[in-house]
């Protein structure tokens, strides 16, 4: 479920905001149908929904372009999830111009940031500063993920309105859905909304499958494997809701209709897109590669500390934010594990970034952390050379080169020997001798021989555990229309029985309300009962009480307490003496 989400600043930043913000009169008129879709009307539209939505924060006028087909996962089919855009005509065109790295860095500094001694951008307006910044402060706790219970979709002239989100152009495409640029009218912020098709998830995953052979045991190491593609999405959502790190993309909101096909996930928009395209004739300099690779190390260390294996690290999944730092995205094939490492047995991810042990025909189980380290090595190679170390158009030949071909470095550009040593140790074909993340953090090239030390694990990581209950409750489902109608009818009839079964409930006698048979009698009721008992003792033995309603004082006749004490129960013989208070307390 890999999706490459990237964006470039638009040449006209004000236009999309006016189009999406709904400032004009025509826009306000088009929003009136959304106000009318409250209550049952809005629920009736749920039956037409066929998606999950994921949204990511983005800046006004941003677009996202796709990575190359070779960078996409093996399962990608390139098909778009169908989305109702009836009545849509011309869609607003977002600029396709990309900024160079020099323009990006200059634009970041012009926005009010400054550089520290290590060349990192310090942005005081952000909720947190870069970890290595001298002005760094503890990060604020992340905003909790919103779980929407109601969804309404309205088609407009050039876009689709989904709750408070206005969906615009497609900015990315993955194996199981598309990513849309979304504008939130409540907070005036752009997001990236991921629309997933449940049917496509199940179909491309090959479900239903045959059960495993008898006697098959799960792989040791405590690796949690989802039972199916839908459960895998829910696990991804539960993981993303807990992650809070400057170098990991954040999940904002999730919407789900259990009776329809689509799931909607909303992510923060990382506006500058992927760190680079592969292949490219303009690779990064060593200083730029070191800057981004330090962020990648901190993000991977945080994920491994949270017991998560990403399994799809590549440049197209490393998105550059406003502050110039990268964020790791796309957890569609990630694995959660227990213990010290994940022992995996399946092969997922992008072919050019797969480790040789995952392609071996003899090795059945392999380390999850070592897979991420190999992918980090291929990514660093791409940073400085603009291409993958092992390439072939035929997938089987590519697998053969990854497993057996020796690592070679091009003559140009000329890189430092320390960098060659680091890449060689990360691309060691033997996972047992391959370098690990704690050793990478201390490598001379990464730290510039001690001049730029990375933060310790305690400073960079805080453990967050995801329970099975949180995975089950990762998405709040929207109730179906029939259920809502049934509940509202039961509330209106004040009955817990099914109002559509045709049987009528027996009418209750007005002479003995249930609350008067169970609640404690008041002082007025007790005094009136004592008065009646005294009057009965003074009357002759053969005297009968006067018929109900046929005389007596107005106070006694109008008192509901006396009415309940004197009234006979339905279907029972009339009593010849009044009820005592303790008798009135006992329900029949």
From Swiss-Prot:
Annotated family: Belongs to the protein kinase superfamily. Ser/Thr protein kinase family.
Protein EC: 2.7.11.17
GO MF annotations in UniProt: ATP binding; calcium ion binding; calcium/calmodulin-dependent protein kinase activity; calmodulin binding; protein serine kinase activity; protein serine/threonine kinase activity; protein tyrosine kinase activity
Description of activity control: Activated by Ca(2+)/calmodulin. Binding of calmodulin may relieve intrasteric autoinhibition. Autophosphorylation does not alter activity or regulation by Ca(2+)/calmodulin. In part, activity is independent on Ca(2+)/calmodulin.
Top-tier EC class: transferase
Name listed for the protein in its UniProt record: Calcium/calmodulin-dependent protein kinase kinase 2
Family matches, as PROSITE patterns: PROTEIN_KINASE_ATP (PS00107), PROTEIN_KINASE_DOM (PS50011), PROTEIN_KINASE_ST (PS00108)
Spans annotated as RP domain: 204-226
Organism name: Homo sapiens
PTM annotation (Phosphoserine): residues: 100, 114, 129, 133, 137, 495, 511, 572
Pfam family name, one: Pkinase
Keyword Transit peptide: no
Region feature (Autoinhibitory domain): 472-477
Outcome when changing residue 182 to T: In a colorectal adenocarcinoma sample; somatic mutation
Listed Polar residues bias regions: 1-14
Reaction(s) the record says it catalyses: L-seryl-[protein] + ATP = O-phospho-L-seryl-[protein] + ADP + H(+); L-threonyl-[protein] + ATP = O-phospho-L-threonyl-[protein] + ADP + H(+)
Gene that this polypeptide is encoded by: CAMKK2
Family matches, as InterPro entries: Kinase-like_dom_sf, Prot_kinase_dom, Protein_kinase_ATP_BS, Ser/Thr_kinase_AS
Upper taxonomic lineage: Eukaryota, Metazoa, Chordata, Craniata, Vertebrata
GO cellular component labels: cytosol; neuron projection; nucleoplasm
Keywords: Acetylation, ATP-binding, Calmodulin-binding, Cell projection, Cytoplasm, Kinase, Nucleotide-binding, Nucleus, Phosphoprotein, Serine/threonine-protein kinase, Transferase
PTM annotation, UniProt: Autophosphorylated and phosphorylated by PKA. Each isoform may show a different pattern of phosphorylation.
Tissue-wise expression: Ubiquitously expressed with higher levels in the brain. Intermediate levels are detected in spleen, prostate, thyroid and leukocytes. The lowest level is in lung.
Localization of this protein: Nucleus; Cytoplasm; Cell projection, Neuron projection
